[in-house]
Structures are given as structure tokens and as C-alpha cells.
């Protein structure tokens, strides 16, 4: 089909996630994905960004190249810290969102500035995943590296910079180390903890509080960067923040480059989500997010007040325990994922009183980092593989429903849910979701929605008009009455401590006071589940987490 089009009439979208780089080539008129390619990323929480650049080149080649591409935009994993010296050289391997060595740094920032102040100014409360906390860690633990920092960028910022023809002095990049050409967008910048989604500007005081240095925004393509004459004490350069369809410039080959976006914001674009839509993404971990024009203010830190990629807001809640819960069920039951789904469907709603509290890796919402998973309400009568499988699916979805409630407490309304991610293909997940959620659930076809969202942004940048692309649905699930949530709450919320929030001084979530015996009768047993119960995840082929410090994969 691409051969029937004139040269350079297509658009490309890139999803540079934690584990891989994916490229889609799209017809801008219809949104049809014509070609695609991918390449793996190195495993780890510290990665040389040059590996991402190599993977991008490989993925572009696998997608058939960009000879017929008129515009491209890059979305990517959020929060990662890339530091550049005055010659554009990466100072140290990037610290990814999943590098949590900066936990103490995040807590120190909250203690110094206050959770309420952070929310009022940045819309979020720092956690270890956020860029500002990583900068504080770098300042305190690697002062020599910190002293060399001339610019700070996020993963998608740096890749866009390279795509524009920039690079370190030691490379063959035609534009050289032009730090003034660094760009970002509001959705990605809002995950740093030194950018305000409210004002759309950097908060340089918060940057100084984190890193102990002054900063300024990149001046843009008309400025001249001279690495040899830049004083050592010059302010740190932060990428210029572009509007939702503002051009970053052109590649050396003449391809228009869009502003890019954070992964969840790009997914919302790819899905065509709007006010009243709430996206529930079930990958390795989970995210719940919804585009809105409302101001978001949650001092507990559970709901991150991020910016969206279309000029609005994207309140987001992350849970650590999503599709990996299904992996654990498969290991525990010594069954395949297909068999676990069949077992779960053979049980009744509520698993005959058996409840899983699914905190296998602690939890982020509520903030219980040291919690473990538990099977509650176990009796001789309900101790069957079918009930265990059902309890695991219900526990996973109830955790996401808690995230949904946290988002809705910000004043949002919900008309429909969009269920995406690898686990959305699981028939038991789809069926049990009807017992957990109280509004209709649309299940879109499996697709690379992050990359498609980036392609949609590229088309928007190219034409000046946001395209309307059809998203095909494979199912619409209608809710049915049940007491599953009530049963779950009776056990899960007995775990919620008074400080179960990101902010140390925030109280118990409003719905945490359910009576501990609600919905369950009789003498029961509790089983605590610990240890490594993970396996290769058939349901979590999404590989990056959501922006609140638990990036969930959102592509299909």
C-alpha cells in the first residue's frame, strides 16, 4: 500500500520503552499501520543511552526505513535521568525509572519542601522514580559527575535530539553538541518533579532544591551553543518545552520531528481517549489514567497530576501488582496461563469467600512498600484450584479498581473504561472485570498504542490538525452486581497504615475504613505469599511502567 503513495506522505511513531524500541509507519489519513519494526533494549536500571539510539536505528530499518516518511515523533519511558556535559557527551549511564536508589533522596525532598508545596507547584509528590529525586542522589553520591552536568534530558528528549542531527563532539552528528536544540513536551516534563503542569513551565527553584544548581530552558534552534566558551558555572540547560503539535525541527534528511510525549500520554493519544474515558492498562504493573481539563491536586501523592500530550492534564495512578499476579497464579497452580483462566472461570464471583490481597512486590497505591501478598478467608470448603485462580484474578483487578477510585476522587467523571495491555486478552480478566467495575468496559484490539499515539502526534504536527483515527473494539463488557469489591476491601484495607501514601504526613485513604469482617463469615485461615513467584509473563507483554513511578506498559 505504501508504494501507491507519493514519497514522504507517511508518518512514523516511536515507542522507546524500557525493554525495546518499536516503530510504526502509519497512513496519516486513516491511521492504518502499514509497517512496523522493533529492536531490544539492554536489561537493567542503568543503561547507556547510545544503546537506545542504536535500537532506534535498528527498529527503523526493520520497519522498512523512513524514505517515505514526512514526519516522526518519539514517545518513551518517563523519568529517566540523562546527564550531558558541555560537549554533549553522556556523563554516566542513564538512571531509569526503575532504579530506586533515590528513595531516600525523594523522602528528603518531601521533608525539606513539603508534600503540599510539591503538589501545588509541580502537581506531584516526589518518589524514587522521578527525575528530581535522581538528581538529588547524583548530587549527593557522585559529586564529580554532578559537577560536569551542563544539560539534563529525559529519554525521549535525548532521542529526539539525536534524531535532529545532534550528538556529542566525538560523534559524526552533523549539528554537533547543540544543547540549545534539546526539546521535550509537557507530558514528559511533568514527571520530573521540577515542572509545573499547572503553569506549563519549569520550576527552577524546585530544580535548584533537587540539584543545588541554577537552570534555564534551552534557547532553541536560533541560539548558538559553544561548548568551549561556556563557563563552568553556567546554568544547567533543560529541554525547551514544546506545545502539543509544535515542531522540534527536521532531521538531516528533511523529516519533520514532532515534540514527542511520555508513554502513557502517547497511549491516550493513540486510543483517542477524551474526557469521560478512563484507561486501565494491565502490563507487568498497572496504570489508571484519564484525560481531563480539571486541575489535579492530591497531596497524598497517590494521584499524579501529570500533563497530557494534548494540552490538558492526565491524572494517573500506578499499581505495582498487575499481570505479574497472573504469573504468580500460574506458578502456584503449576498451570499455564490458559489453564489458570479456565480454572478462574469455573469458580463463582467472590471465589467462594477466598480473597487475594495481591501485594507481591509491596504496593504503590496504597503506598505499602514492605507489604506481602496474602490469601484470606481460606477454608476447607474453598481450598480448590478454581477458587485460588479466581481469587488471583479478582485481587489483581480490585487493586486497579482502588486506583480508579483514587482518580475519580479528583472530581473526574467516568463514562467508559478502556481496558488495554497484555492481560486484557485473558478471558478470565475480561469476565471478572464485569464483577469489579461499575461502568461499561471497552476492550480495544491489541495494538502498539504508544507508538500509534506518537504517530498521531507526528500527523498533527505535519498538518496542524489532530487526526481522528478509528480504534477497533474487540469487546464491550457490561457490569453486573456483585460483592467482590466489598469482600476484597474487608481484607486489603486492614493492611493500610496511617502513612500509606507517598507523602509521609498524609492520612489513610478515604475508603480505607471498611469493617474487617465485611462480607465474610466463619472461621478462616490466612496464607502469606512470599518469595520469587514470577515467570515469563504471557499477559504482560507491555514493558514500561506508568508515569507515577510505576510505568505500566500500555501498548498491546
Question: What residue spans do the PLM features occupy?
Answer:
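Short, glycine/acidic-enriched loop or turn micro-motifs at the edges of active sites
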Residues: 18, 30, 102, 188, ...
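Active-site core segments that coordinate phosphate-bearing ligands/cofactors
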Residues: 12-13, 110-122, 136-182, 196-209, ...
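N-terminal glycine/serine-rich phosphate-binding loop of ATP-dependent small-molecule kinases
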Residues: 1-93, 104, 120, 148, ...
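Asp/Glu-rich intrinsically disordered low-complexity tracts
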Residues: 222, 228-232, 493, 499, ...
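Short clusters of small/polar residues that mark proteolytic maturation junctions
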Residues: 37-38, 95, 293, 318
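Short beta-strand-loop/turn "lid" adjacent to the catalytic site in phosphate-handling enzymes
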Residues: 65-98, 122-131, 151, 160-196, ...
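Short, basic and Ser/Thr-rich N-terminal targeting/leader segments
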Residues: 7, 17-20, 68, 75-77, ...
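Short alpha-helix plus adjacent loop in nuclease-associated cores
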Residues: 99-112
Amino acid at each position: 500500500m505504501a508504494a501507491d503513495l507519493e514519497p514522504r506522505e507517511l508518518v512514523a511513531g516511536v515507542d522507546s520503552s524500557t525493554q525495546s524500541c518499536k516503530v510504526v509507519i502509519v497512513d496519516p489519513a486513516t491511521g492504518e499501520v502499514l509497517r512496523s519494526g522493533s529492536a531490544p533494549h539492554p536489561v537493567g536500571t542503568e543503561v547507556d543511552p547510545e544503546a537506545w539510539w542504536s535500537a532506534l536505528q535498528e527498529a527503523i530499518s526493520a520497519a522498512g526505513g523512513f524514505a517515505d516518511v514526512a514526519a516522526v515523533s518519539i514517545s518513551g519511558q518517563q523519568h529517566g535521568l540523562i546527564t550531558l556535559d558541555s560537549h554533549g557527551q553522556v556523563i554516566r549511564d542513564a538512571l531509569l525509572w526503575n532504579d530506586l536508589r533515590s528513595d531516600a533522596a525523594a523522602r528528603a525532598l518531601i521533608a525539606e519542601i513539603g508534600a503540599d508545596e510539591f503538589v501545588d507547584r509541580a502537581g506531584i509528590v516526589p518518589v524514587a522514580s522521578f527525575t528530581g529525586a535522581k538528581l538529588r542522589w547524583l548530587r549527593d553520591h557522585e559529586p564529580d559527575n554532578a559537577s560536569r552536568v551542563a544539560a539534563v534530558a529525559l529519554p525521549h528528549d535525548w532521542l529526539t535530539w539525536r534524531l535532529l542531527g545532534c550528538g556529542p563532539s566525538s560523534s559524526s552528528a552533523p549539528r554537533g553538541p547543540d544543547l540549545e536544540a534539546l526539546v521535550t513536551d509537557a507530558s514528559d516534563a511533568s514527571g520530573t518533579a521540577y515542572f509545573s503542569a499547572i503553569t506549563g513551565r519549569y520550576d527552577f527553584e524546585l530544580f535548584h532544591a533537587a540539584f543545588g544548581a541554577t537552570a534555564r530552558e534551552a534557547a532553541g534552534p536560533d541560539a548558538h551553543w559553544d561548548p568551549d566558551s561556556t563557563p563552568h558555572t553556567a546554568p544547567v540547560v533543560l529541554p525547551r518545552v514544546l506545545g502539543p503539535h509544535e515542531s522540534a525541527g527536521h532531521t538531516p534528511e528533511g523529516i519533520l520531528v514532532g515534540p514527542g510525549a511520555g508513554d502513557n500520554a502517547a497511549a491516550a493519544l493513540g486510543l483517542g481517549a477524551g474526557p469521560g474515558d478512563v484507561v486501565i492498562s494491565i502490563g507487568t504493573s498497572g496504570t489508571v489514567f484519564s484525560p481531563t481539563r480539571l486541575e489535579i491536586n492530591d497531596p497524598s501523592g497517590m494521584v499524579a497530576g501529570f500533563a497530557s500530550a494534548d494540552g490538558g492534564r492526565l491524572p494517573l495512578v500506578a499499581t505495582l501488582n498487575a499481570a505479574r499476579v497472573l504469573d504468580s497464579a500460574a506458578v502456584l497452580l503449576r498451570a499455564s496461563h490458559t489453564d489458570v483462566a479456565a480454572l478462574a472461570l469455573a469458580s463463582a464471583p467472590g471465589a467462594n469467600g477466598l480473597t487475594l490481597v495481591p501485594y507481591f512486590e509491596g504496593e504503590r497505591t496504597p503506598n505499602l512498600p514492605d507489604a506481602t501478598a496474602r490469601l484470606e478467608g481460606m477454608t476447607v470448603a474453598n481450598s480448590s484450584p478454581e477458587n485460588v485462580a479466581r481469587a488471583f484474578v479478582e485481587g489483581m483487578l480490585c487493586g486497579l479498581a482502588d486506583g480508579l477510585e483514587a482518580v475519580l476522587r479528583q472530581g473526574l467523571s467516568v463514562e467508559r473504561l478502556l481496558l488495554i495491555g497484555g492481560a486484557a486478552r485473558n478471558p478470565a480478566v475480561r469476565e471478572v472485570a464485569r464483577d469489579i467495575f461499575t461502568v461499561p468496559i471497552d476492550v480495544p484490539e491489541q495494538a502498539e498504542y504508544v507508538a500509534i499515539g506518537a504517530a498521531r502526534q507526528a500527523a498533527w504536527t505535519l498538518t496542524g490538525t489532530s487526526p481522528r483515527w478509528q480504534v477497533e473494539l474487540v469487546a464491550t463488557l457490561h457490569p453486573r452486581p456483585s460483592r467482590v469489591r466489598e469482600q476484597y476491601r474487608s481484607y486489603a484495607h486492614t493492611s493500610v497504615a496511617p502513612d500509606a501514601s507517598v507523602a509521609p504526613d498524609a492520612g489513610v485513604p478515604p475508603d480505607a475504613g471498611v469493617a474487617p469482617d465485611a462480607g465474610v463469615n466463619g472461621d478462616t485461615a490466612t496464607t502469606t505469599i512470599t518469595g520469587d513467584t514470577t515467570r515469563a509473563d504471557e499477559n504482560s507483554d507491555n514493558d514500561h511502567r506508568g508515569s507515577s513511578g510505576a510505568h505500566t506498559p500500555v501498548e498491546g
